């Protein structure tokens, strides 16, 4: 079930590859937004 090419990367899991990709992208964008906001506040 876990494929090195597109299995569980970064702790992202999904029913299928499409759902898995969408979940990963959503999480990455959310984390990036938080990091950008924190950088702006600090800087």
Swiss-Prot record:
Top-rank lineage group of the source organism: Eukaryota
Gene (UniProt): NTF4
Role played: NT-4 could play a role in oogenesis and/or early embryogenesis. NT-4 interacts with the low affinity NGF receptor and elicits neurite outgrowth from explanted dorsal root ganglia with no and lower activity in sympathetic and nodose ganglia, respectively.
GO biological process, one term: negative regulation of neuron apoptotic process
Pfam families: NGF
Record InterPro entries: Cystine-knot_cytokine, Nerve_growth_factor-like, Nerve_growth_factor-rel, Nerve_growth_factor_CS
Record keywords, A-Z: Developmental protein, Differentiation, Growth factor, Oogenesis
Protein name: Neurotrophin-4
Family, per entry: Belongs to the NGF-beta family.
